[in-house]
A protein has these predicted regions:
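Tandem repeat scaffolds
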Residues: 2-388
Length: 388
């Protein structure tokens, strides 16, 4: 069937073109939409071995294209709003600037598809394959991408406000400067994803996997990260104000110059993390794991570190004045020139800790274990300097 026959049959009132062979058809610019009478092209084949089907600017609003073969088709600026593309093959198709708002793309193959500047507002895309697709600057506000495959996809500066990414795969995807405000990312896979400068305000990342992700300057204000894995990620200059990080894994993360105002950190794993210069003053860090963490020049004054694990941590020149370190483990830690004035170290483990030049003036050391500790030049609780 060529374009002329299709249009003649359409003009005659025919709307059902299921199983039609439309290989190599050129329909641009056409209008296949009349009021509520949308065409049915179920299982239609619009492919040709050597030529791409051209549907540039075509109006297929509300069309039924279930399982249609549209791979490599040029649908740039086409209107597919409300269309049914369930199970359709759109692999490597061009949909730049297309209108797919409210379209049903459940299980569709959009791998390598060009969707930059496309409108996918409210689109239904669960279990869709968007691997390697370009969605840069696309609008996906409140779209459903649950369990979708977006590995290696480009979503740079995309509007992903309120999008459902639950259990989806975004590994190696680029979401640089994307707007993910209130996005649902529970259980999603973001291994080595680039979210630098992205906005994740109030986003839900509970139990999400962000291993080795680029999260520089990312905004996590009021985000839910409870149980999330951010191990080995770069969070430098990120904003985590009022975020929920309960039981999150931030081991070996880079956290320099981050803000943590009013955030929840109970049960968090910060072992091996780089927190140099970070302000954790007066934070509730009871039982926290900071083993082998880099905390040089960090501010932990007045922090609650009861039963915290700081074994092997590097705390040179850190401020822990007035900190609560009852039963804390500081064994084998580097505490060079640390300020522990008026800190409570009752029953703390300081075995083999290096307290050279430390300030312990007014500190409480009741039942603290200092076996093997180095105290040369340290100011002791009574104000005297240890010389031996």
């Amino acid at each position: 069937m060529d374009a002329k026959e299709l249009l003649n049959r359409y003009a005659a009132g025919e709307r059902d073109f299921r199983l039609a062979n439309l290989r190599g058809i050129v329909l641009s610019p056409i209008d296949l939409y009349r009021s509520s009478d949308a065409p049915t092209l179920i299982l239609a084949n619009l492919n040709q071995h050597q030529h791409r089907p051209y549907l540039i600017g075509a109006n297929l609003s509300g069309a039924d294209l279930t399982k249609a073969h549209l791979s490599r088709a040029n649908l740039s600026k086409a209107d597919l709003s409300g269309a049914n593309l369930t199970g359709a093959n759109l692999m490597a198709a061009s949909l730049s600037g297309a209108n797919l708002s409210g379209a049903n793309l459940t299980g569709a193959n959009l791998a390598g598809c060009h969707l930059n500047w496309a409108n996918l507002t409210g689109a239904i895309l669960p279990k869709a394959n968007l691997a390697g697709a370009d969605l840069s600057a696309a609008n996906l506000t409140k779209a459903d991408l649950g369990e979708a495959n977006l590995s290696k996809a480009y979503l740079i500066k995309a509007n992903l406000n309120g999008v459902n990414f639950k259990d989806s795969c975004l590994s190696l995807a680029s979401l640089k400067e994307a707007d993910l405000t209130e996005a649902q990312l529970t259980g999603s896979e973001l291994f080595k994803a680039n979210l630098a400068g992205a906005n994740l305000t109030r986003a839900n990342l509970s139990k999400a996997k962000l291993l080795q992700a680029n999260l520089r300057r990312t905004n996590f204000t009021q985000a839910y990260l409870n149980g999330a894995c951010l191990s080995e990620s770069d969070l430098s200059e990120a904003c985590l104000d009022r975020a929920n990080l309960c039981k999150a894994d931030l081991s070996k993360t880079y956290l320099r110059n981050i803000t943590l105002n009013g955030c929840h950190l109970s049960g968090i794993n910060l072992s091996g993390a780089d927190l140099g210069g970070v302000d954790l003053s007066r934070k509730l860090l009871t039982g926290i794991n900071m083993a082998e963490a880099l905390l040089n020049e960090a501010n932990l004054s007045g922090a609650y570190l009861i039963e915290a694990n700081l074994s092997g941590a590097y705390l040179s020149k850190a401020n822990l004045s007035l900190a609560y370190l009852i039963k804390a483990d500081l064994s084998n830690s580097c505490l060079h020139e640390i300020d522990l004035s008026k800190a409570n170290l009752s029953k703390a483990n300081l075995q083999k800790a290096d307290l050279t030049g430390a300030n312990l003036r007014g500190a409480i050391l009741t039942e603290a274990d200092l076996r093997g500790a180095k105290l040369i030049g340290a100011i002791l609780p009574n104000g005297t300097v240890f010389r031996h």
